[in-house]
Amino acid sequence: MTSPVAQCASVPDSGLLCLVMLARYHGLAADPEQLRHEFAEQAFCSETIQLAARRVGLKVRRHRPAPARLPRAPLPAIALDRQGGYFVLARFEPGADQAVLIQRPGQAPARLGQAEFEALWAGELLLCACAASPTQALARFDFSWFIPALVKHRHLIGEVLLISLVLQFIALLTPLFFQVVMDKVLVNNAMETLNVIAVGFLAAILFEALLTGIRTYLFAHTSSKLDVELGARLYAHLLRLPLAYFQARRVGDSVARVRELEHIRAFLTGNAVTVLLDVVFSVVFIAVMFFYSVKLTLVVLAALPCYFLLSLVLTPVLRRRLDVKFNRGAENQAFLVETVSGIDTVKSLAVEPQWQRNWDRQLAGYVAAGLSVANVAMLANTGVTLISRLVALGVLWVGATEVVAQRMTVGELVAFNMLSGHVTQPVIRLAQLWNDFQQTGVSMQRLGDILNCRTEVAGDKAQLPALRGSIELDRVSFRYRPDAADALRNVSLRIAPGEVVGVVGRSGSGKSTLTRLIQRMFVADRGRVLIDGHDIGIVDSASLRRQLGVVLQESTLFNRSVRDNIALTRPGASMHEVVAAARLAGAHEFICQLPEGYDTMLGENGVGLSGGQRQRIGIARALIHRPRVLILDEATSALDYESEHIIQRNMRDICDGRTVIIIAHRLSAVRCADRIVVMEGGEVAECGSHETLLAAGGLYARLQALQAGEAG
């Protein structure tokens, strides 16, 4: 009989399957293929399970309880066995034998005795619970976004607030000490009382320093968690935005918006929020000040409407100027990115002086915008300082009259003046931080432009099953912008599984648009795109794209090794599979000639490789995960004739068992296709085999004659 340990270890990727089981137990949709695609090609470990659990709406926490405490653990949970596999710990059944109910992926539930379970279990549990509602991710991003985040960390926030309250009460002791010293010690020459007060004052100082350090640590810890959460959400959201979002914006503008995260981070991790807490807790000091003197307290409080009026007048001006500063900064960022990206063109055209003049002009505009912001901030700070000085003068004058009239003692006046400082100083510091606060508001608005855009990934969309390769376009029309002409107009096309279809036509005829709709990079304005009978408009786009292989006209390579670039969609691919894909793409020979072969690190976008070499690596990358549908969008246009000949020679093997769409300007690239579709003006002009289209004497025949003439 097979032991429980062996049975559990033999289940492939038991961690992933256990997570899916628990997600479905909690009523959450979880697709194992989608999770494997997003998080790991190899077996899930505990850390990967925790990450994937967030994706499906679960919170998972690692726990190592003592065996005696296991019956009190929240179940069901995922348990780790001694062989590194996972199983579901369902429940402990009451009784003398303390039976344990477990379930291994793909098997029926099993009852184990306590000793048998302890022999199986490695001591680690992954406790699972439903996370916040998935609809929470769709909430608008503004300052209210931090409310659920603060609720999530409410225990830490509560500790910070409690410490802040204690610090305010400690701060109350300092004025009282001074009052006692001036009214009792100095008048009566009570040195023993002075020594007692000094010891008490020293203890208060040390305790205050300790609590301040603890508060700073707790606040920095909480702020860092919020910072990580916001940064992770921003990047994940950016990756899930549709292609149309990026095409409608310059790269530099998007980068500038992402960089606004730095302002929010600085605000969260700086002293701004502690100042806000001090302002809130100043109500304690105001209450004590009323106890000392109502008249003096009213003098101090009379300044608060002045601060408010100053803010009311200057805030709109400051906000407008901050908007101008951001826009100028975004223009600079976009221009810089554009310059660096196109530096070869700038140098080849020798337009550096013109670019330098443009940069100087834009930089001057940005500096001027920054100076205008600084001027408004300086005016606000000057106004606040003036008001605070007038308040100090009023307190001194009114307080002196109260002392002369013997309605206050000198010690009480000094204590009141110190208490009023605890009210006015946070307000003054808040005014000095007002520029940062407004900058943070602008940053939130700019980041909201990204985070409030709807993504193309929706958790409630159906997962596409394994493809057979049937593609149908049913009266499809599409335009890139509402005010633009149709890029595709009433296109209907059927492609059978395993069929090789070539798509040709003049530039701008809609060839690439056709394949982008099949990839669901864009959604058709009218009509439907169906794959294996499934309308791709209502399926999860990732479940579609991971079954497609796409090679664009220019393949983007990343700053990693050749092997990693080829195995990008299958990080767990073996070296044999990588080499097989490279051979099929005609890339193996030149890769072997690189300094470190497949381990050679490539520069950004494959710098150092020729266009043809980059393209062949791109083709190998598209083939590595054995897609059922392969799209070659001008994939051989950058190849020399020898490289193209290698690809054409391997085309039969490349196309074997899959549906292939070949877009090409060179008609020789589609001659092997089962069927050729000729596009013209966004419509299907002709369709048929190479010989049929030549015999028809239409657009395809004219294009063939033109290319034959050029070749001649």
Swiss-Prot record:
Superkingdom in the source lineage: Bacteria
Residue span(s) of domain ABC transporter: 471-706
EC numbers, comma separated: 3.4.22.-, 7.6.2.-
Record's keyword annotation contains Transport: yes
One cellular-component annotation, GO: type I protein secretion system complex
UniProt xrefs under PANTHER family: ATP-BINDING CASSETTE SUB-FAMILY B, BLL6336 PROTEIN
Reported function: Involved in the export of calmodulin-sensitive adenylate cyclase-hemolysin (cyclolysin).
Sequence similarity: Belongs to the ABC transporter superfamily. Cyclolysin exporter (TC 3.A.1.109.2) family.
Protein name per Swiss-Prot or TrEMBL: Cyclolysin secretion/processing ATP-binding protein CyaB
